[in-house]
Amino acid sequence: MAKHRYLPMTEQDEKEMLDVIGVKSIDDLFQDIPEKIRFKRDYDLKPAKSEPALLRELSKLASKNANTTEYASFLGAGVYSHYIPTVVDHVISRSEFYTAYTPYQPEISQGELQAIFEFQTMIAELTGMDLANSSMYDGGTALAEAAMLASGHTKRKKILISGAVHPESSNVLKTYATGQHIEVEVIPELDGKTDIEALKKALSDDIAGFVVQYPNFYGQVEPLAELEKLVHENNSLLLVSSNPLSLGLLTPPGEFGADIVVGDSQVFGIPESFGGPHCGFFAVTNKLMRKVPGRLVGETVDENGKRGYVLTLQAREQHIRRDKATSNICSNQALNALASSVAMATLGKTGLVEMAKQNLDKSHYAKQKFREKGFEVLFSDGFFNEFVVKLSKPIKEVNESLLDEGIIGGYDLGFYEEKYENHMLVAVTEMRTKEEIDAFVASLEGAK
């Protein structure tokens, strides 16, 4: 018999395995661990519960969490509360799709491959680029991979990054760069945008590329046309990290001449989930096609002339070239990419534009309300769905108070930047109502 209900190994199985490897007992397997630190007591566990009782207890624990179903969320900074069409979960739950792994066998994976191909097509169209890959882990790693590509392509070992790029993405880039012996220089932010004069001074012959966020971490829309001219005059690459939803209204980076556009498609069909897993995207111009990291799905025809989909240009990848690959990314976020594809397809072009417009309109309404109530709102009105409000109290204290009123407050900018202590980054998406926005502004009156 098995010793444990959920472990199929019997005592005889255990004995046979120990005999094969030449030890007498399970304890002998752990002889390298000093005796004094081995756990030998009984586990102090509560008595077993029935499944209904266990579900009740877990539900009670889960109810302690603040969620965006019952709370009005104004928290963004890279992860947002957006409308997710009901059909998304139905499609991604199908057994044919329910994997995050790469479909290596095209003959049995046409549905999955076509779904990825559609994701690539929609991302390329949104960003205004020639092609996109099948997805990355998230926006931060996609940005870092873009910088590695720029360095490899230009044979230069220095990357410039705007101080208005999300600090976490910037930190991911610095981590990647350390292993590749690439220098990263941060161009300071000025009034919520990249300091253009500082960028001009920093550009030199050893700069592989410049990274900018559009809209940036503070919600501001960067002047890509001006930045593109400066960067390309230096024969460097322009790398843009973008919120794909904003591109329903804003001019795509590709139309400004961006070389690489990356970001996170969490805004389409993927819940916040405490920060992940999400889905990065990576789009480039044709000249960089053979240096793209990750999978690429291409459309072809079989011997009968029927349309089919396959993984293409695989010679770039680590399972083929090992240490000479363009990147060490192996799998991708296929399931989350599918969720984004279904969400975008469900919205359609008109729906996506409407969703973006609601973000723009509602966030500008909120900013207007803050100003009417006498709050100091920073920077220009050129933003998409996030802006910065200065308060008189610590943001952590304010947010704890807001929770009591059923509101999830904005992001504490002082966490990363001392000069922005008591400054809140407010995100307003299409999910927020006029009543919720008004209540949020009213709740902050005491912290004005």
Curated annotation (Swiss-Prot):
Gene3D superfamilies: Aspartate Aminotransferase, domain 1, Type I PLP-dependent aspartate aminotransferase-like (Major domain). It catalyses: N(6)-[(R)-lipoyl]-L-lysyl-[glycine-cleavage complex H protein] + glycine + H(+) = N(6)-[(R)-S(8)-aminomethyldihydrolipoyl]-L-lysyl-[glycine-cleavage complex H protein] + CO2. One of its GO terms (molecular function) is glycine dehydrogenase (decarboxylating) activity. Its EC number is 1.4.4.2. Keywords: Oxidoreductase. The keyword Oxidoreductase applies. GO terms for biological process: glycine decarboxylation via glycine cleavage system; nucleoside metabolic process. Pfam families: GDC-P. InterPro entries: GcvPA (IPR023010), GDC-P_N (IPR049315), GDC_P (IPR020581), PyrdxlP-dep_Trfase (IPR015424), PyrdxlP-dep_Trfase_major (IPR015421), PyrdxlP-dep_Trfase_small (IPR015422). The keyword Coiled coil does not apply. NCBIfam families: PRK00451.1. The glycine cleavage system catalyzes the degradation of glycine. The P protein binds the alpha-amino group of glycine through its pyridoxal phosphate cofactor; CO(2) is released and the remaining methylamine moiety is then transferred to the lipoamide cofactor of the H protein. The glycine cleavage system is composed of four proteins: P, T, L and H. In this organism, the P 'protein' is a heterodimer of two subunits. Belongs to the GcvP family. N-terminal subunit subfamily. This is Probable glycine dehydrogenase (decarboxylating) subunit 1.
